């Protein structure tokens, strides 16, 4: 499985998502939208908004949280094959 996480250091939901991935020993490539040229535009092009974190799992874009409500642990566990 290839996992890419679009994030930024100031994003609380991004930090929570990365803690979840670390807890389950899931490797991923992180793309910081503040540092990588055109990364924010890529997020907008695929999702229609500049919202992070965004996960790309084997080429499929997934938003693992609801703004103001937090990270979706159960949904991401299913998508990542965590029991």
What are these model-predicted stretches?
Residues 28-30, 61:
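Conserved beta-strand scaffold positions in the cores of enzyme catalytic domains, especially
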Residues 12, 38, 71:
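Short alpha-helical
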Residues 57-83:
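Non-catalytic, surface beta->alpha helical segment in thiol-disulfide oxidoreductase systems
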Residues 12, 34, 63:
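Nucleotide phosphate-binding site architecture
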Residues 32-50, 56, 78-83:
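Thioredoxin-like thiol-disulfide oxidoreductase module
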Residues 1-26:
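Local sequence-structure signature of Cys/Sec-based thiol-disulfide redox active-site neighborhoods
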């Amino acid at each position: 499985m290839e996992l890419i996480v679009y994030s930024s250091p100031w994003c609380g939901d991004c930090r929570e998502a990365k803690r979840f991935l670390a807890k389950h020993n899931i490797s991923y490539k992180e793309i910081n939208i503040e540092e990588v040229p055109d990364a924010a535009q890529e997020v907008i092009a695929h999702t229609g908004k500049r919202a992070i974190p965004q996960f790309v799992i084997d080429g499929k874009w997934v938003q693992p949280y609801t703004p103001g409500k937090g990270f979706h642990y159960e949904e991401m566990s299913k998508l990542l094959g965590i029991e």
